[in-house]
Amino acid sequence: MKSVRTALIVLAGVAFGTTQVDAATLGDVAAALAAPAASPQATNDWTAFAKLKGAQWQGKAPKRGGDKYYWNGNVPIDGVGSGQVSLVGGQKALDSATVDWPKDIALAKVPEMLAAQFPKGTKLEQVRGACPDERLSGSRIYRATLAGRKSLYLHVQYAANDRGAATSTIEMEPQRNKGWIC
């Protein structure tokens, strides 16, 4: 009886576009990227992403391109839909993770979005707000610290397109990227 009830809940979730059982959250991506607090390095190695919920990686391992390694995959994002994750790093440790968000990000609602995507107890602190002359596009920078993990910086972006399309991304790095300007 319990399995029938669980199946009905999952089917209702699929039908109404709610939570997916095998979907990752931004918190899952951040936990895979950020090293444990006691670790001497800021980020984890590549294997931390091998078990990301629902991820379908392109290839079995990262591929070298120039002086960096790259690994891209499709991943269902809890409560949002199908997104993509792009990882960049050295041979052993990661430098960054970028999540291509499948929906438009409402910049005014970023705090609520992050709170819904990270586990309770995560410290989320806005370190840069709106840019001057921000109308259709913009970004925000947050510092996120999950319990027992090193901090990460999140660059939350929404870019409108003159053809009606838009791009929404969340970049994660262990240090604030100087390229994240207005």
Predicted regions and their residues:
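Short, low-complexity, Pro/Ser/Thr/Gly-rich segments in the mature regions of secreted, periplasmic
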Residues: 167-182
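Mature extracytoplasmic/lumenal regions of exported proteins
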Residues: 136-143, 148
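Broad, structure-driven detector of short, well-ordered beta-strand segments within folded domains
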Residues: 78-89, 150-160
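Long, charged/polar, surface-exposed segments that mediate recognition or autoinhibition
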Residues: 80-139
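Sec/Tat signal peptide C-region and signal peptidase I cleavage site
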Residues: 17-23
